[in-house]
């Protein structure tokens, strides 16, 4: 008889399922508790109350769709808006900080994908503790940089509001008025969205692993 973890592996055809259960063929109480953890109403499972489609084909969750939209559409638009703001106003500090923060996000994702590929092939965890903390510093620094740049450019005397006010003083028939207001508003929205997006990425990366460490009481870098 073959053994695995001190449990005999028997042919399923030789097992009397009714005899293994309790009364009327029911499972023992301990097995019922074990199997209940796989139910769809588990409070601690994030997808427990998600609406599952009737078909059995794999589908993307809303988080995956939002990530793809942010990664492929939103962040490139932030880069374009920052570049247009620099080209129109000549102010380079805030656009450079926003562009650096967005590029840092892409670099960290590329590094995580590369480490995941290399370490999984070596049967290791994707991240080591030093790499995890290094990525936390990079992502947290990028988020802080984007926030400071957005706040400074928005509320400085010669910043975003100054350009909006100056644009509103132009004649309504002047085509530069609408162009200047559009670029300024788009750049302002892009800067604050970039700051919020960077902070969301940092907290999502850090808190998930911090919570896992607190639950398992062991450093698990994944």
Swiss-Prot record:
Membrane topology: Multi-pass membrane protein
Name of the coding gene: UL20
Chaperone is among the record's keywords: no
Source organism per UniProt: Human herpesvirus 2 (strain HG52)
Protein family (similarity comment): Belongs to the alphaherpesvirinae UL20 family.
Swiss-Prot/TrEMBL keywords: Host cell membrane, Host endosome, Host Golgi apparatus, Host membrane, Host nucleus, Membrane, Transmembrane, Transmembrane helix, Virion
Domain of life: Viruses
A Gene Ontology term for the protein's cellular component: host cell endosome membrane
Protein name, UniProt field: Protein UL20
Family matches, as InterPro entries: Herpes_UL20 (IPR007629)
The protein's assembly and partners: Interacts with gK (via N-terminus); this interaction plays a role in the coordinate transport of UL20 and gK to the trans-Golgi network (TGN), and is required for their cell surface expression. Interacts with gB.
Key word Metal-binding present: no
Coiled-coil positions: none
One of the GO biological process terms: viral life cycle
Functional summary from the UniProt entry: Plays an essential role in egress of virus particles from the nucleus, cytoplasmic envelopment and virus-induced cell fusion. Forms a functional protein complex with gK and this interaction is absolutely essential for their coordinate intracellular transport, gK glycosylation, expression on host cell surface, and function. Together, they modulate gB-mediated virus-induced cell fusion and virion egress and therefore actively participate in these processes.
TM spans (from-to): 64-84, 98-118, 131-151, 182-202
Compartments (UniProt record): Virion; Host cell membrane; Host endosome membrane; Host Golgi apparatus membrane
């Amino acid at each position: 008889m073959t053994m695995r973890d001190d449990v005999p592996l028997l042919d399923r055809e030789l097992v009397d399922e009714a005899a293994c259960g309790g009364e009327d063929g029911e499972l023992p109480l301990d097995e019922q508790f074990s199997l209940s953890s796989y139910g769809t109403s588990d409070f601690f499972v994030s997808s427990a109350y998600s609406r599952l489609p009737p078909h059995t084909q794999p589908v993307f969750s809303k988080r995956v769709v939002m990530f793809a939209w942010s990664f492929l559409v939103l962040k490139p638009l932030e880069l374009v808006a920052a570049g247009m703001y620099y080209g129109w106003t000549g102010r380079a500090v805030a656009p450079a900080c926003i562009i650096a923060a967005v590029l840092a996000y892409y670099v960290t994702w590329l590094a995580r994908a590369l480490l995941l590929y290399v370490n999984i092939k070596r049967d290791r965890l994707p991240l080591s503790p030093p790499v995890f903390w290094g990525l936390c510093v990079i992502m947290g620094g990028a988020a802080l940089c984007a926030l400071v740049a957005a706040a400074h450019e928005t509320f400085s005397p010669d910043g975003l509001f100054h350009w909006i006010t100056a644009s509103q003083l132009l004649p309504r028939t002047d085509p530069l008025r609408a162009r200047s207001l559009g670029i300024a508003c788009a750049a302002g929205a892009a800067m604050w969205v970039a700051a919020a997006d960077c902070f969301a990425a940092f907290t999502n990366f850090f808190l998930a692993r911090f919570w896992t460490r607190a639950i398992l009481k062991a450093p698990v870098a994944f």
